[in-house]
A protein has these predicted regions:
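Primarily auto-inhibitory N-terminal propeptides
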Residues: 7-107
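A cross-kingdom C-terminal cell-surface attachment/processing module
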Residues: 485-503
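Protease zymogen maturation seam
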Residues: 56-63, 81-136, 144, 148-150, ...
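Structural recognition of the beta-strand scaffold that forms the well-ordered cores
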Residues: 19-21, 67, 91-93, 136-140, ...
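Catalytic-core environment of secreted peptidases
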Residues: 140, 151, 187, 316-366
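Subtilisin-like serine protease catalytic core
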Residues: 124-156, 162-211, 226-232, 307-310, ...
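Substrate-binding/access-modulating region of protease and related hydrolase catalytic domains
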Residues: 127, 132-133, 200-308, 320-322, ...
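C-terminal subdomain of the subtilisin-like protease fold in secreted/lumenal serine endopeptidases
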Residues: 226-237, 268, 310-313, 381-469
């Protein structure tokens, strides 16, 4: 590593003045997009703010309205807390920044980097299935490089929303579903699967909660309104915010509510990286750490969310089965996350091998999560009628107790094993006690009523049509293979430009 990224002096944990708000359903029925926009504008004006973006389709059933409003004079965090006391508001939060969860280290590609597939005993399950073209996995990330020949046959171009110019999303996608048995590159957990790249993070690997909510709503719409058979949603990113984990705080948080709207469909397992700062999921930080953790009293999200029944948090393992020193502790499960070889940007010519496939070796909980996402899709290819909750139960129920004192003593994660998950699925499928189809109904979150899902996602159609353009950033791109940048996808970056509905807005 010869260089480090330069950080913006003005960068903070959230976008200045931005608050994501979920308004209560309007009292009148039959609201239109125009009336939703008017209501958002009226609300913002009443608070001395203005509308930065709306998601009007959420109001089509009269169940609520997502919007981002901006104040030129108030701190976003204080403003959000004030808005939570407004009777019109269901949820409010600052527009926190999020980052791809890759460690600031890179290693040289070598043949042993496929160790992860053997560690989870994937080959023993490949004897039964190598995947299915009827199964989809959504990757909410930086996009997927359409030109990588080891991914192209498994990318669903109709639903994917933007190509990758950073590298993180492409690497994650390869772990899930690089095309297998084709004589080039690497193999993913699935050799046959349909990958949907949902671009929510920018060229520098960073984004905001509003960007992520856009991605979640897009995936929710594909499942609920278009019938797309998505069995896993991979979310390999993290942010540290001061939201204390509790029922009352979560139900008032827009990020949690968007995830819950996806969760209650019970169609897709939501797989989340635990984070890379040696913290504990659900526990407060004790001090400032680098540019990611502002100080004491912060929590890693989305990994610390509770009440998302179909979510699995994933820590990272070393090759010896111990927990990686960078991995956050307290995840549901741990999977290979150190020195993982996978697909990368074709534009990084120094990464392109003799067979024409760009490959790179990276470490992080970002790499651990897609092993689990890929496994959920592979298990679904064997038994397609499994619900998300049944897939989660198979994955966790079939995990192995760690033989590593480091893992057991420090965090208690079980070790993910695909073969054992498959055995659990075969043994207990149909057992209403050990593999129930639906989550329990007696929890403190059971009374949550889902909001309507969008039917016209905000900016993704523009990416697909080539009208939206690429995000641009002054923060620098992803590292890797003589890229010339330093840390890979971690840090606080300068504000970037996002294209939304052909309107360029600085966020």
């Amino acid at each position: 590593m010869s260089a480090a990224l330069s950080f913006s002096a003005s960068a903070s944990e959230y976008e200045d003045g931005d608050v994501i708000v979920v308004l209560r359903p309007a009292e009148v029925s039959g609201g239109t997009v125009a009336s939703s926009a008017f209501r958002a504008a009226s609300f913002a004006a009443s608070e001395g703010a203005w509308v930065k973006e709306t998601y009007p389709e959420l109001s089509e059933s009269g169940s609520g309205l997502y919007t981002v409003i901006h104040s030129d004079t108030r701190d976003a965090k204080e403003f959000a807390e004030e808005l939570k006391n407004n009777p019109e508001v269901l949820a409010a939060s600052p527009n926190y920044r999020v980052y791809a969860t890759t460690t600031p280290t890179e290693t040289t590609v070598n043949a042993t980097d496929t160790w992860g597939l053997f560690s989870i005993d994937a080959p023993s399950v490949w004897d039964t299935s190598t995947g299915s073209r009827n199964i989809y996995v959504a990757v909410i990330d930086t996009g997927i490089d359409y030109s990588n020949p080891d991914l192209a046959d498994n990318i669903n171009f109709a639903y994917s929303t933007g190509t990758d110019t950073h590298g993180h999303g492409t690497h994650v996608a390869g772990i899930i579903g690089a095309y297998g048995n084709n004589g080039v590159g690497v193999a993913g957990v699935n050799w046959r699967v349909q990958l949907i790249g949902v671009r929510a993070l920018a060229d520098n690997g960073g984004g905001t909660i509003a960007d992520v909510i856009n991605g979640i709503n897009y995936v929710t719409d594909l499942i609920a309104n278009k019938g797309v058979n998505i069995k896993a949603v991979n979310m390999s990113f993290e942010t540290y915010i001061s939201l204390v984990p509790s029922h009352d705080n979560f139900v008032k948080d827009p990020f949690w509510r968007a995830l819950k709207d996806l969760d209650v469909l019970n169609k897709a397992v939501i797989v989340v990286a635990a984070g890379n700062y040696s913290q504990t999921v659900g526990q407060p930080t004790t001090k400032k750490q680098g540019n990611m953790i502002p100080g004491a009293g912060y929590y890693v999200y989305p990994a610390s969310f509770e009440g998302i029944d179909n979510m699995i948090t994933v820590g990272a393992l070393n090759t010896d089965g111990s927990l990686a020193n960078f991995s956050n502790k307290g995840a549901n499960i741990a999977a290979p996350g150190v020195s993982i070889l996978s697909t990368y940007l074709q534009s990084r010519t120094s990464c392109v091998k003799a067979d024409g496939v760009s490959l790179h070796t990276i470490s992080g909980t970002s790499m651990a999560a897609p092993f689990v996402s890929g496994a959920a899709a592979l298990l679904a290819s064997i038994k397609p009628d499994l619900t998300a909750y049944q897939l989660k139960r198979a994955i966790l129920g079939g995990s192995r107790a760690s033989s590593s004192e480091q893992v057991e003593a420090s965090s208690g994660e079980s070790i993910f094993n695909l073969s054992d998950a498959y055995d659990y699925q075969k043994t207990y499928a149909g057992n209403a006690t050990l593999m129930p189809a639906t989550p329990p109904t007696n929890t403190e979150y059971s009374d949550y009523t889902a909001h309507a899902v969008i039917s016209k996602p905000s900016y993704y159609e523009e990416y697909k049509n080539g009208d939206g353009g690429s995000d641009s950033s002054s923060g620098g791109g992803g590292g890797g293979c003589n890229a010339g940048s330093g840390f890979f996808a971690v840090g606080i970056f300068a504000p970037f430009v996002m294209y939304v509905k052909r309107r360029k807005i600085n966020i």
